[in-house]
């Protein structure tokens, strides 16, 4: 291992030959960075990271355009990263996340600070619960995982339960750990927001005694969905 820094940081005199080499290095660095775009994707297990990776493969053009997919906390944190994190130029997120940042977080001039580029496949929200829980209303007072903080499910799930007036004990647990806790009975349900193709649900054994709950549409969240 080694700790390295630019010689400029130490104020050392640089020989002329090294200065010329440094000039060449600087031009290479400038060219490489001129058309490099950082895309905030999401969690490694999520569909948004898959989108970012596919964009990188499809748009790659060497030094003319290089797309770098970035692993992040998820769709809800991606707008924060786009606004404030160095190296993030593009973010994959959801329309409800944007509306939340604009209307609830009241981020100043958000509609002019970020711009819509392209529509991606629609995300679908799923609530996976034990078989003895028949409806979403049965989760009142129960422990529900909304996925990791910053993930799209953490925001969308919270909005849905709040608007329906169903109070639950909210937990923010990684999806794979959440599934294990659901099967062991430590939690009662989990919220997962994904876009196709994701094989998370198809890999759950048929004898796991779990099922998906219906989410009734309500005018209470019609302003978002």
Where are each of the predicted segments found?
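Structural recognition of the beta-strand scaffold that forms the well-ordered cores
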Residues: 68-69, 89-93, 126-128, 146-147, ...
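Bilobed "Venus flytrap"/periplasmic-binding protein-like clamshell domains
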Residues: 34-61, 123-184
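Membrane helical hairpin/interfacial module
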Residues: 82-85
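Loop/turn elements at helix/coil->beta-strand transitions in domains of secreted/extracellular proteins
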Residues: 64-65, 87-89, 141-142, 187-188
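N-terminal hydrophobic or amphipathic helices and topogenic motifs
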Residues: 1-68, 111-113
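A structural signal for short loop-to-beta-strand junctions that line the ligand-binding cleft
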Residues: 108-120
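Pocket-lining segment of extracytoplasmic ligand-binding domains
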Residues: 95-96, 104-105, 167-225
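Early extracytoplasmic/lumenal segment of secretory-pathway proteins
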Residues: 66-77
């Amino acid at each position: 291992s080694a700790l390295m820094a630019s010689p400029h940081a130490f104020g050392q005199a640089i020989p002329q030959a090294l200065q010329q080499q440094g000039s060449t290095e600087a031009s290479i660095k400038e060219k490489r960075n001129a058309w490099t775009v950082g895309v905030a994707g999401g969690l490694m297990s999520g569909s948004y990271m898959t989108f970012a990776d596919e964009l990188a493969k499809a748009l790659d053009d060497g030094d003319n355009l290089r797309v770098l997919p970035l692993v992040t906390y998820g769709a809800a944190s991606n707008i924060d990263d786009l606004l404030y994190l160095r190296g993030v130029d593009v973010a994959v997120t959801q329309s409800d996340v944007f509306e939340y940042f604009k209307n609830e977080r009241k981020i100043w001039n958000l509609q002019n600070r970020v711009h819509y580029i392209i529509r991606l496949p629609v995300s679908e929200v799923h609530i996976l619960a034990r078989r003895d829980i028949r409806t979403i209303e049965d989760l009142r007072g129960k422990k529900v995982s909304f996925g990791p903080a910053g993930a799209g499910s953490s925001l969308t799930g919270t909005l849905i339960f709040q608007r329906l007036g169903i109070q639950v004990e909210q937990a923010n647990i990684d999806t794979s750990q959440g599934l294990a806790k659901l099967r062991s009975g430590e939690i009662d349900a989990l919220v997962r927001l994904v876009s196709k193709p994701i094989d998370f649900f198809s890999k759950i054994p048929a004898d796991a005694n779990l099922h998906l709950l219906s989410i009734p549409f309500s005018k209470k969240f019609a302003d978002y969905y």
